[in-house]
Amino acid sequence: MKKRKFFFTGVIALVLAFAFIACDQDKKCNNKHQATDYSVSDNWLKIPTVKHQVDVFYLYPTCWDPTDADGLVNTIDNASMRAKAPRVYDEQASCFEGVANVYAPFYRQLNAMKSLSYSLEEQEQLVADVPYHDALDAFNYYLEHYNNNRPFILAGH
């Protein structure tokens, strides 16, 4: 189980490396040290009723429209993200629902447009910040509380 957890933690890190990069080093990322509580069902976009023998753990792409007032990392209750994420889920992940139990957490995201102004080295250093930890915490919570040793697929955009 530990090897499987370690392997999939690495896979999630790679997915996040491509999807969510950068945080302004001159400013602290908001919510940096506050973990999202994934025992709260409102912090999940999708928690299915188990009907299938396999699960999908899905991470949607950046789904918020940052404003200057938002900062570099959105909050877990960001209205823009919570409005867009279900639509993106319907377009990208609902196709799995006929064959799998699809789990999708809400997670804080970095401002993707600002990330373009950073060097790759800076981006790599910043990847392990808030969004990575939210996704990893959600994945670990899923494994410990929802998965029940079913096989699973990691899906993301």
Residue spans for each PLM region:
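Conserved alpha/beta-hydrolase "nucleophile elbow" surrounding the catalytic nucleophile
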Residues: 156-157
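Active-site catalytic motif of lipid deacylating hydrolases and related acyltransferases
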Residues: 61-152
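N-terminal extension/subdomain marker
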Residues: 26-86
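Bacterial N-terminal signal peptides that target proteins for export
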Residues: 2-10
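Hydrophobic membrane-insertion alpha-helices, especially the h-region
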Residues: 13-17
